[in-house]
Amino acid sequence: MSDAGCGLLLFSPAGVLRSVVPLRRAAARLGKLGFSVSIDADATARIQRFAGDDETRLAALHRIAGLRPSVALATRGGYGLTRLLDRIDWKRIARSVDAGTRWVGMSDMTSLQLGLLAHGGGVTWAGPLACDDFGRSSAEGGVDDVTEGCFVEAMSGALEAVGFRTDVGFDGLDVRGTLWGGNLAIVNSLLATPHWPRIKGGILFVEDVNEHPYRVERNLLQLHQAGVLDA
């Protein structure tokens, strides 16, 4: 990677890590990709289903924002960031982005990403999770080569385009706008809250897994009926 040895910090803002093995495996693999990897002191904390209590996880966010690593990569998703949104120092997070920190993740990280967009903006990265994407064993399918390659290129500034599979005959679209979104369930949960970004003419993307089709349809209908898809 062109930004060889850039600092990458692993942290757990939401669900608890059930095992440290995937975390260690992810750190080792990311190190081999050229990142200088460190692990937040509370990344393996455990309180019930969370990676530490709310105070611990909130302090970790603010601490990481102060450290300003090149990449702040969440270890996993789950649930927990929504509980912190009313107390996050958004200006501190925004200053870290301005200083070059790339906050990366998906799933529950959508709460932080959209919250930051709502409270003054700042570019974040919808991307892989350390343990889920870089911590899998060979028996679990290992690391996806495309994910690995795109992540390295994106974090080094070398990624020029991302391709998607589409139906036969689809000729593509020529549109421009703010690219925003994330996990569909989290996107919907932020509607009518202070942490909902008001985007006009944007391009909304959504992701979700293990949801029944009717739930996906219900969430999309809610966005449509709330006027989000017509903005």
Show the residue positions of the predicted features:
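Short, conserved loop/helix-junction motifs that constitute active-site signature segments
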Residues: 3, 91-99, 226-231
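Short, solvent-exposed amphipathic alpha-helical segments in soluble enzyme
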Residues: 24-29, 89, 219-225
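Internal helical hairpin/lid segments
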Residues: 195-231
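ATP/NTP phosphate-donor binding region
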Residues: 1-68
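Short, acidic/small-residue loops that bind anionic groups at enzyme active sites
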Residues: 90-115, 123-130
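N-terminal glycine-rich "phosphate-gripper" loop used for MgATP/nucleotide binding
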Residues: 71-87, 106
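Conserved anion/nucleotide-ligand pocket segment
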Residues: 122-188, 192
